[in-house]
Amino acid sequence: MKYIAKYTNQFRKDFKLCIKRGYNMQLLKEIMLALENGEELIEKNRDHCLFGNYISYRECHIQSDWLLIYQIHSDVIVFDRTGTHSDLF
């Protein structure tokens, strides 16, 4: 299933910070495109559900300490946050 992508304002800020830090944004874009297209991520990305304050969210790893937090609602995928563990939690 193909999803319509939406981005929170916080995600846009996080995205700019990742660029400033010199992260390989192509990796993030590839994973986001795969998620938008409804593809299953490879095991290395450790895609999983979150709990607690993030009960309806999912998280995947772009790299070992670079995460992407997102939500899926029917036909929409909302990219909420990206950054390191210490940035997000």
Regions found by a protein language model. Give the residues of each.
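Basic, Lys/Arg-enriched alpha-helical interface segments
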Residues: M1-S64, I72-D80, S86-F89
